Amino acid sequence: MTEFVSRHIGPSEVEQTQMLNDLGLSSIDELVRQIVPDSILLRGDNKLPDGCSEHEALTELKELAGRNKVKRSLIGQGYYGTITPPVIQRNVFENPAWYTSYTPYQAEISQGRLEALFNYQTLITELTGLPVANASLLDEGTAAAEAMILAYGQSDRKIILVDSKIFPQTLAVLETRANPLGIEIKLIDLEETPDLGDISLAFGLIIQLPNNHGKLRHPDGLLRCAEVYKCMKIAIVDPLCQVLMQPVGEMGFDIAVGSMQRFGVPMGFGGPHAAFFATTDKYKRKIPGRIVGQSKDSQGNKALRLALQTREQHIRRDKATSNICTAQALLANMSGFYAAYHGAEGLKQIANRVLRYRQLLLSALKWCDVEVDESEGFDTVRFKGKKTLEDFNVRYEDGWTILSLDECTTCLLYTSDAADE
């Protein structure tokens, strides 16, 4: 304990005085004045209140937070209400054994953690119909950008075609990553006939399923054209919707990415949330991030390890194909446990309930003579007019009101005083 104290607790007042004397200084303030430039040195009263105890600070913060009017968010766009099973919240989300181990430095020692991540990867491959998945990435935007860069490396072309109804935050990340690489992003409207000339010049095609308006397209013709012109096909797909729809791998996509947030991970004011990345065997040595693989130990027993690490920068440095080792292991494990908790049939029930509520809301709006968008979709309702919903946050776009339903949805009611704006 004595050694720990001397190494990890700061110097005492006596030691501070001795160090100042050795420097020929009389106080820490004098030391600061000699180091910090005058232009940024804080002088005089900082106008901060007196210090208080932790309990007093928490009490005041709770009082301030209580002034907020909390509304249910139905904005969607990759962020949805979800129910975290109490057993996962207590034993994983709130358990330091899970949440402090943010990345497996000595991975093979932690076989339990690797098994949980292996379970997550298996979930992703079963959902997407693609054979290889990594152990998560930072968010959907990052995963989409990594998919773009993987596709870019397979061709000498410079153009990527992107669904114009992609989530805006994902498009922003794509633009940020594309600019320094000289990649040109060309937005396309999937509701119009694609220009074959555009496809022939592009190295990749990114489609959001469902899109920003909640529409669920089946771009079979576009995918066939992309295949002919050797244009890689990337799907950004909602995993809960994927439970009910044909796996994107079977549709013909080469890469699938998306956010696992709605698999039991709280919205958390926008994050953090685990993103998934799945692809074909052809690109398994180009896939970004960590991959957990199954092997055998020295006694021949099944053992898990981090696989294909020659892709990563701590092995190959400048020749690495993966320069992103940080993952969202805690949130990936939560979503994997969420799927195990509910099972395949439970996930289908949740997804079908969301779809059923969407259909009920559409019917109710039409009964009230409200113009609605009846395009095929999963969880999003789009109707004409701008309605004020007292207890909900929704989207308004070009004269339309847009809201997305989720696992927490039970019944949506317009109050009698809801008004057109």
Positions of the model-derived regions?
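Conserved small/polar residues in nucleotide/adenosyl-binding loops
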Residues: 414-421
